[in-house]
Every structure is written in C-alpha cells, then in structure tokens.
Amino acid sequence: MLLIYGIFAFVVLVFFYLLGKETGGEMEEEYRLREYLEVLKNRNVVILSVIAFIGVGIFTAYLTWVEPVLEEHGLTVETAGLTATAFLLGGIFGSIIIPALSDRAGKRKPFLYLCFIISAVLFYIHAIAFGMAMVAAVLFVLGFFFISALPLALDLSATSVGEQFAGTANSSLWLFSQVGSVVLIVLFESMASWNSTLLLSAGLLAVSFLLALQLKE
C-alpha cells in the first residue's frame, strides 16, 4: 500500500511540474537545476546523500514497523509502543550532546564514525535482546547515537559547499532520505522475519561507516 502511495505521489508531482509552471519561470528553473547539478559534483554531498538514504530510511521503517518488531522480542502491543519511546528519548539527548561535543572538538567525521559503528553494533544486540527492560535500555543508547548522526551530516554537507549552496546541499540529503524511507518501509515488510530487519539495519549502518571514511573535512 505504501508503495502505491509513493507511486501516486510521484505521478501527481510530474503532472504538477508539467501543468503548474509559472509563466517566465523557465530560466529560474534552469538555474536551479544547474545549481543542484553543481552541488552534486561535491563528493561529500553525494556520500552524505547516500548515507541519508540509509539512515533516515532505517529510522522511518523501524518506527513504522516497531510494534511487530518488538513483539518478536517478548513485548506486547501495549508495552511495545511505550518501550519504543526510549529510542526517541535517547535521540533527543543525543542530538543535543553529540553535536555539542563535535562543536567543541571542531570535528564532524570522528563523531559520525562513532555514531555509525555503535549503532550498527546496537542493532545487532537489539536482534538478540529480549524483555522490556533490556530492549528499552538498548533502544535508548541506540537512539542516542543513531539519531544524533543526522545533524552532524547536515552540518558537514553545508560546510562542504559553502554558505551559498548550503540549502541546496541539504535539500539533496532530504530528497534521498525520503526516497530511502519509502524503499526501506516496503523492504522491511517483505523480509522473512522482523528480526531480519534489525540485522539488515546493522549491515547497512556498517556500510554507512565505510562510506563515512571517504568523507573529507
């Protein structure tokens, strides 16, 4: 069903583009396209866009299917939703603390490495953890490191191209992240078991770590 919604939204977007263009706006659209293509020549932006595809895709897909995932780990429908809040709560703290530490150090890459590798390990631990207390503890720490990677990626993307193109660079990350969300939501649902989605997430975050090694700061 989500795939159908995604296709429908894409068709609507195409019709809007073809029929809803303002008069005299062709030169402006051409300029924006050239600007976007110019930004995509930046290696950091391309790598971070792929990382956003993976990271935000995992985040959205996990929260979409969190109840059946946690039910496989001994939680009821009622406790699954409550336990999942630990993931978001950890993310709130992480998104404040990790970027602040990064600012103090004047570095982004080491903290991205840390976030990705710890998140990959914690998704694996999540796959073998059972019981409300254990799962909640894992989710809190996972959210702390996993969610805090996004503000670091956005900042590194913006600084890689300069203030003039910062908005365009970050829009690329958001575009790829939305595509990743649709793709991974559908992929998670099609997998053999919900537990296998956690192992897939761990593997994809390991790939993100390897991609982050190619970033320049």
Curated annotation (Swiss-Prot):
PROSITE patterns: MFS. It is found in: Cell membrane. Keywords: Cell membrane, Membrane, Transmembrane, Transmembrane helix. The chain crosses the membrane at residues 4-23, 44-66, 76-98, 111-128, 132-154, 166-188, 198-215. It comes from the Archaea. Pfam families: MFS_1. GO terms for cellular component: plasma membrane. One of its GO terms (molecular function) is transmembrane transporter activity. Its main location: membrane. It is a multi-pass membrane protein. This is Uncharacterized protein AF_2102. It comes from Archaeoglobus fulgidus (strain ATCC 49558 / DSM 4304 / JCM 9628 / NBRC 100126 / VC-16).
